[in-house]
Amino acid sequence: MEKGKTSRLIPKFMFSHFSHHVATGVLIPLLPLLRESFGLNYFQSGILVSSFSLAYGMGQVPMAILADRFSKRLIIILGLIGVSLSGICVSFTQGFWQMPPFFVLMGLLGGTYHAPASAFISQNISIDQRGRALGMHVTGGSASFLLTPAMALGIASMFESWRPAFLLLALPALLAGGVIWLTTSEPAEDPLIPDKGTGKRLAEEKAQEAELTWVGIARAIGILVCLTITMNVVFASINSYLPLFMVDHHGISAEWAGIVVSLIAGAGIIGSPVGGALSDRLGRKELILFSLTLSGPLFFAVTRSPLWVPLILSLFFYGLTMSARMPTTESLIADVVPVRRRTTVLGIYFFMTMETSGVITPIVGRLIDSYGLDPVFTGIAIGLCVVAGVALLFRRHI
């Protein structure tokens, strides 16, 4: 892809990322309205959530393999269109049991986006700007987490029904699929290599990477990626219970407690591009270890900060630090893994994060039921500090 086109590529994929998560993120904020409309109990509500989330995780690796085998661009386009049509179909359902199949379909088709999009972007952006580009791409998802609940509830309130929210918020993904289809093309090479100074060395490194086996990939980046997956899983589990922590520990209302997750997502709008850009300058490993090192102390600060300004600052910097490692890890994978396997490795990475989070979150909930929020959150903070200490001690071998 020509240089002029690459400068316009990232805004298109930021919009696609935003649209993807808007279409797939409508369910949770509208769940109370669905429960009221169909008279659902907690078990049935859980079926709706699980039918999407389990399929979403399970779809990552198969879709990534298809993208490596055929076309990343085609898989992305079909996925965006499919996710949109699935959301539209949900808006026309007339009974509870009509909904799970469409959420399963939405989840499977949702697996077409993250790994193929990250691989496609990395294949079109020069290696010295890859972290910044992937960081900007992540902000599209972060913005959707911040805005989707308000948009979904606002539309539902305006039309006095949940159906228009599913319908209208599915349309941007359809538009994004059309934009990617009409304005992008298959990349001719991987990746654009700087012409000055390091071009020869980078070309030699790329030739070596093309020969990497699965064992070689695991040796090169396995430990760092596992550290990131650990942070991702802990981050997802913590986010699930932070609103409850705000209510129980600080006594604030449930409505205000729900803003906590939005605040962390808002921090990601800054943290992702900054973290990606810093990784271009300082190195991928250094940024991942830096994020890991700060995660424990900052989460401990969240659990101990008094209400309002200190707590808001702790939450913001916690979200900032945790979001910095996402584009950095994607860039690390793109730097090392050959093109023919890159989407598959990214798919495995996203699969491990999503499915492990789904298992660990209820375990954390069970521990909270048994021992209370404060001891469990403190234990998690200490555990993160221990993991960071061990990683720093052996950093030369990672």
Model-based region annotation:
Residues 27-28, 219-265, 269:
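Extracytoplasmic gate region of multi-pass secondary transporters
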Residues 34-35, 66-67, 154-160, 246-247, ...:
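Interfacial helix-cap and linker-helix signal at transmembrane-aqueous boundaries
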Residues 58-94, 279-285:
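Conserved MFS/SLC helix-loop-helix module at the cytosolic interface between two early adjacent transmembrane helices
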Residues 102-140:
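Cytoplasmic helix-loop-helix junction between adjacent transmembrane helices
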Residues 137-186:
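Helix-loop-helix hairpin linking two adjacent transmembrane segments in secondary transporters
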Residues 184-210:
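Flexible cytoplasmic inter-helical loops of multi-pass small-molecule transporters
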Residues 282-329:
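C-terminal transmembrane helical hairpin of 12-TM major facilitator-type secondary transporters
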Residues 336, 340-373:
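A late C-terminal transmembrane helix in Major Facilitator Superfamily
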